[in-house]
Amino acid sequence: MNDRYSGTFYKVTTRDEIHHGFSYQDGENVLIEPFAEEGSCCSGGLYFTDKTNLHNFLSYGVWIREITLPLNDERLKVVADPSGDKYRANILIFGKRYSLLDPDTFTKFDLPMSRCYQKLQEYITSNETDVEAYENAFKTSHGARIIFDVLKEKSAVESHGDVTIKFLLENSASVAVLVYGKERV
C-alpha cells in the first residue's frame, strides 16, 4: 500500500457515531456494501480526511476520531476522493476520540474554533461577567454547558460573527442533547 496512507487520519462523527446507517465503533470498521472505486461523496466507502482538511468537516458531528488504515491487510481498498479533501476506504481503524465541545481539542488540532473560544472569553470579559468562574468552567466537565449557555446569547453571535458559533446556535437541539443528555426547551 502507498506510503501516502500511512500515519494518522481523522473522521468527525456524530454523538452516536452512526453515519448514513453505518455504526462506527472503536477498532476495526469494515464496509458491508461493495466498495466504490470511483465517484465523489458516494455510497460504497467509509470517508476520512487528513489534518490539513479536518476543519472542513467540523459541522458533521461532535467527535473527532483518530483513524489509521490496516496497510498490511489484503482486503484494504483506498481511493482519494476527487474533491481533494477526503479519502474513501473499505476498512478504518478507529482510535482515540476527542470532543468538539472541549476547547483543548481545538488547540490540539490547531482548528479555527480556538478563535471562537478566545472570542467567547473576550465577550465574557467585555460584559463584566465573572471571568474567573468562566475560566474555571472551561477547564471542567461542566464547561460545555456554560459555553452552550453563552452561545445562546444573540449579542455574542452578532458581535463576533463566528461561523462555528452560528452553526452551534442553529443546531442547539443536538448540542443540548450532547451536553444535557436530553433536549432543552
Regions of interest found by a model, annotated:
Residues M1-S43, S59:
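ADP-ribose/NAD+-binding catalytic cleft of ART/PARP-like enzymes
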Residues M1-S6, C42-G44, H55-I64, T68-V185:
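Conserved NAD+-utilizing ADP-ribose enzyme module
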Residues D50:
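A helicase ATPase "motif cassette" and its flanking acidic/Ser/Thr-rich regulatory loops
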